[in-house]
């Protein structure tokens, strides 16, 4: 919902430039210590198709994860995946890169689903889910070759974070422990950015 509000503000008010300067992941500013910029790009989207795709993916992927693990772990995986995606975009991207969007967070949700599919691969449902998720991931892997300025590093980082968090969640049913896992993963992303 916040992303939609910020999209309206950037598209229909004179605040676009100010909000992008304040919240976009500008790697040169991350290098100067503005580590929070690995989180804040999830509030910004560069165009109607960008936000529509991300909000559609959130709507499709999110509710079952939230029902399965609880609201706070879901919020945690979303933010932790955004942070790891941002850290990947910082570490593997160019110092001149500027990134906006929630794709790292969305790919974290793909990562959780991929983990669930891999864990259930010996069932018919798991095999079908694995094929569906695999197809969507292959399609998304091709996008950077077709559409310029896609932060594939953020996609990859988010996917890995979501998969790892999903694996760690499978080891506990305790909601507080699941939240702690997401905080630890986000903390590692921040520490990586601060160290490098």
Describe the function of each predicted region.
Residues 1-196:
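A detector for small-residue-rich transmembrane helices and their helix-helix packing motifs
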